Amino acid sequence: MKTRAATTTLTTLFATTLLAVALPAHAYDPKATIADLDARLAKIGAPHVEGAEAVGGRAAPALLFGERKINNNFDVVDAVRKAHNATATVFVKDGEEFVRVSTNVLTPEGKRGVGTQLARNKAYEAVSKGQQFCGEIDVLGTQFDACYNPIKDVGGKIVGVSYIGHKK
C-alpha cells in the first residue's frame, strides 16, 4: 500500500510541476500568435510603402508602419519569437512577389532570410487574394504550423504580408 501511495504522490507532484512550467494556452496557437504580430505592427502606425531599401543584397520597396521603416528592423519579429517561441516575418509586396524585409527565420547558413521571396504556394495564393492562410507549410526547407495575413494600406491595397510559424 505504501508503494501505491508513493506512486500517486509522485504522479501528482509531476503533473503539478508540468502545469507550473507550461506555456500560456495561446503560446502555440498560430492564430493567436499572428494576431499578436499584427497588433504589434498596427500599434506602430498605418502600413505604407515609401521608396526602396536593400534587404539581403537586393532592392525592395521600403515598408513602413507609421514613420518606422520595417526593412532590416527586427525588433517586432524578435519580440514575437520571445513571446511565443515562433518564427515571424514581414514581407513587402514587390510587383507580383512578396519579399522578406524583416524576419527571424534563418537560412541554412544561419543568416536572417531577408531578401528571399514567399514561395508560390497555397499561402501565396490566399494572401494574394486578401485572405488569411493558416496550415502546415514549408518555410526555407523547414515544416511549420503557420499563419499568413495580408497587410493592407489605408486604401485597402495589399502592400505586404505578415507571417508566424511554430516549428513542427
Where in this protein do the model-derived segments appear?
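Extracytoplasmic/periplasmic sensor domains and loops in membrane signaling proteins
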Residues: N71-N85, S102-G141
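Conserved beta-strands of PAS-like sensory domains
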Residues: L64-K69, Q143-K168
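Extracellular/periplasmic ligand-binding regions of membrane signal-transduction receptors
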Residues: Y28-I70, V105-E109
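Short N-terminal helix-loop-first-beta-strand/juxtamembrane motif that initiates sensory/input modules
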Residues: T33, D38-G51, V77-F98, C134-E136
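Hydrophobic beta-strand positions
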Residues: V90-V92, V105, P150-I151
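Bacterial N-terminal signal peptides
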Residues: T11-V21
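Sec/Tat signal peptide C-region and signal peptidase I cleavage site
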Residues: V21-A27
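N-terminal secretory signal peptides that target proteins for export/translocation
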Residues: M1-T8
